[in-house]
Amino acid sequence: MGYEEAFFRWAFLIATVYVAYYFLVSSDKKLATKPQKSKLTKLGKQKQRQKQKNTKKDTLVNRETPSKKSQKLETSDALKSKSKDSSKKEPVVVPKKGTPKIFQENHKVKKVKSPKKEKLVGKNPAEKEDTTDVEDTQKLEQKHSTTPSSLKMKSSISLAAITADDSLHNSFSSNDIDDGFQTVTSSRSYGKKKSTEPLTKRQRQNQQKKLRAKEMQELADEEQRRRLAAHRKELHEANRPRGGLNNSSRSAYSYINNGQAGSSKGNRYDSLW
């Protein structure tokens, strides 16, 4: 009886363990499969919502497009009409010299633009348009000028020569003009032209400072010259030739010239000792 009881007990334990293991494994499988299904369902629902939103937007756009197209057409027609109106230019009426004033008042006279100025305006938009009458400059010069062409050429050459000479004589350094001093307008041919405006307090102070600095520089230059002159004098006295054969200031060449250091008769070092 002891063996049978032991066998039944072991069989019961093994069966309970197997049943517990089976239930645990099945529950784990269910937990693993459930979130995947929920995720898939959520993604499907989100896609459906996006599709519904897109369809609503498409319907709204399709409803609004004809009105927008009509607005675009209206704006394009208005622009075309404006461009046509601007392209139509009124004819320019230029009165002759003998026309009366009544004609000029009735017919508005427009001033013709010069072609040269129009080109300049096109290059630089900041410049204003010039509405002066078109007149040939060469013809005006021929009318008003009484000097012949030969004299004109000579005068231009002489002016060029004068300016070249003046630039050599009247050349000024950058130190002559300063921001804090009196304003000076310099030109190549006529030198300097001082302005008639009175000096301010700051300009006067700067001018006084410059004058003081100039005086101090002159004093320093004079002192330097004196020192250099004294130094030159000392050097001259030191290098002056002195009498006597046994003088320490004499050079070796003086002995050779006298025939003492370089002579073969006497002892070479007698005069030195």
From Swiss-Prot:
Keyword Transmembrane: yes
Record's compositionally biased regions (Basic and acidic residues): 55-91, 115-144, 213-240
UniProt keyword Membrane present: yes
Coiled-coil ranges from the UniProt annotation: none
GO cellular component, one term: cytoplasm
Superkingdom field: Eukaryota
Key words of the record: Cytoplasm, Membrane, Transmembrane, Transmembrane helix
Annotated Low complexity bias: 92-101
Main subcellular location of this protein, as a coarse class: cytoplasm
TM stretches of this protein: 7-25
Region (Disordered), start-end ranges: 34-154, 168-273
Compositional bias segments (type: Basic residues): 36-54, 201-212
Sequence ranges of Polar residues compositional bias: 145-154, 245-266
Membrane topology category: Single-pass membrane protein
Compartments where located: Cytoplasm; Membrane
Protein name: Uncharacterized protein C13E7.07
Organism: Schizosaccharomyces pombe (strain 972 / ATCC 24843) (Fission yeast)
Phylogenetic classification of the source organism: Eukaryota, Fungi, Dikarya, Ascomycota, Taphrinomycotina
